[in-house]
Every structure is written in C-alpha cells, then in structure tokens.
Amino acid sequence: MIRVGINGYGTIGKRVADAVAAQPDMTVAGVAKTSPNFEATQARKRGFDLYTAVEDRADQFPAAGIETAGPVDDLIADSDVVVDATPSGVGAENRSRYAAHDTPAIYQGGEDASVADVSFNARANFEAAADADHVRVVSCNTTGLSRLLAPLREQYGIEKVRATLVRRGGDPGQTDRGPINDILPDPITIPSHHGPDVNTIFPDLDIDTLGMKVPATLMHMHSINVTLERDPDAADVRDVLAGQSRIMLLDDDLGIDGTGPLKEYAQDMGRPRGDLWENCLWGESVTMDGRDFYCFQAIHQESDVVPENVDAVRAIAGDADAAESIATTNDALGI
C-alpha cells in the first residue's frame, strides 16, 4: 500500500484524500491543516489523522477540541508520497521541506512549472513522471485541455489550437472572489497563461488561449477551435472522444444546456460533493469545417484534477503504467 500524505485539506486536498482512501493500493497517511475550521473537524470525522501545518497555530486545535497527531513534518516523514494541496505559492515554499525528508511530492497547477521535475497529465504524459521526486499536476483548465488535445493529436495531428476560456469568478465557498456584476478579460493580454501551461505537457504544440472571468461559481466553459492535420467527419471525431474515459460526451437528449443542469446531473448521479471529474463535452457542439474542429466543454474546477493526483502518485511509485493506473482510479471513483 502506498502511504499518501495530503498537506492542505481545502477544496482540492479533501477531495484527493477521499479519492486516495477509495483506491485499492493506497492509504491516507494523514492530512495537514493550518487552522481548526470545519474542514479540520470533518477530516477527523472521516477518520483521517490530522497534522498541524503551522507551528504557531498548533495550540489552536486542542483549544477547539480537535485532536492532532503532530506537526506536518511527522506526516511528511511517514508518507511514501505527499500531495501538496496548499494555496498557490505555498507549495514552492514547502519544496525544501519535502526534499529534506526525501519524500516525493506532487504539487498543484497554481505553482510555477519550475517547482517540479515534470508537469503531469495522466492521459498525455504519464510515463514522464516515473520515479520523479517532484511532479506538478497542471491546473484544472490545462487538465481539461490536455485530455481533449491528446486523442485529437494522436488520431488526426494538430496544426493549431485556439481556445477561449470563460472562467468562473470563484468557487462556491470563496466569498472573497469575483467579479459580482462584470465580465473581465483576464488577462487582457494574449495569450492567457493556459497556453504556455499546455506547452509544459505538449512542448511543440502551437496554441493560443484567451481568458475571461464571469460572475459564476459552478464551472469553467471552454470554446475550442483546433485546426487538424486531417479532415475527419464530425461523427468520427465524436466516436474518438466518446472513447475517452475522462471525457463525458453529453448526449443531446439529456437536455443539459448549461453548467447548472450539469451540476444537478452530478448530484442526481450521486457524485460526492456533486463532483464532475471528467471533461463535460456537448456532443452536439462537435463540428468539423474542413480541417477545423469546434466544440464546447465545461470543466469542474474543484474536482477534475483529483483523479490526476491519484495517477501521479502511481506514476511516482512506478507501480502501474498509464492505462492500468487510469483504469484503477476510474473504477475506484466510479468514473
């Protein structure tokens, strides 16, 4: 069993902890929190050993009636792999701590690519992370783009990618995010950071990305145009995408016309926290015009990187190849 520590038990960390706990070959060594909030309480209720991430705040946990197992360094030392799910920038600060314990670490997409030996997407470059000490799972949007582009590239070749990302202003629990009543080019300059981030997975890919922020919390939306090297018909492309385990091709007759019904669909399916780990791609939007491919896809920013973190653990451990790991993760989560 691979012992996985999770440093940071917020939006991503708590989901990764549950996903790791569901795997047949992994166990949660513990989770670390900076403060004794409701998430810390729930971590203990779920049976996870809780470690304190900030020494100066360690006494706040017993004062709040929350039992802890020790400082985060104890968790790192006791883990085969640590998933760093701390806020952007904190992971880079933690890098030396993981190195001091000789514990491999997985970082999130909010960190600069230089924090890791390799940026990771299970569908696109699983083998690149084999035996690495520091791996960065790319961001939610880059994950969604990589999952889509990998099969298109393999089947048809790609000449050029153009993607407009309509991004949610904040997660449902982020009361300090916005905009509230505005539509923002974000950034105003082109490209947005997503294109260069995709190039950490596909270094030679020609891609332009534009970003926007809108007053929504549920999901991101991508408007995609890819000029392929071949000119397949739309039905053929739909079949290829339908065969991807982490692309949910939405049938027309489902009546899902936006991200609101999508989240309702996830809840009706019994998904934990209403999570959608897959790209949600409207089958009806798949269009070919000559060699130009078009589609719309929605990305659940709180959860699509979760299975990627699980696969990154196996890649580092060297216990499975890409197909085996993806299948095991998917089966355990119900993807």
Swiss-Prot record:
Gene3D superfamilies: Dihydrodipicolinate Reductase, domain 2, NAD(P)-binding Rossmann-like Domain. It is found in: Cytoplasm. One of its GO terms (molecular function) is glyceraldehyde-3-phosphate dehydrogenase (NAD+) (phosphorylating) activity. Its main location: cytoplasm. It holds the Pfam family Gp_dh_C. One of its GO terms (biological process) is lysine biosynthetic process via diaminopimelate. It catalyses: D-glyceraldehyde 3-phosphate + phosphate + NADP(+) = (2R)-3-phospho-glyceroyl phosphate + NADPH + H(+); D-glyceraldehyde 3-phosphate + phosphate + NAD(+) = (2R)-3-phospho-glyceroyl phosphate + NADH + H(+). NAD(+) binds at residues 11-12, 110, 168, 301. One of its GO terms (cellular component) is cytoplasm. Keywords: Cytoplasm, Glycolysis, NAD, NADP, Oxidoreductase. Pathway: Carbohydrate degradation; glycolysis; pyruvate from D-glyceraldehyde 3-phosphate: step 1/5. The active site is at residue 140. Homotetramer. Belongs to the glyceraldehyde-3-phosphate dehydrogenase family. This is Glyceraldehyde-3-phosphate dehydrogenase.
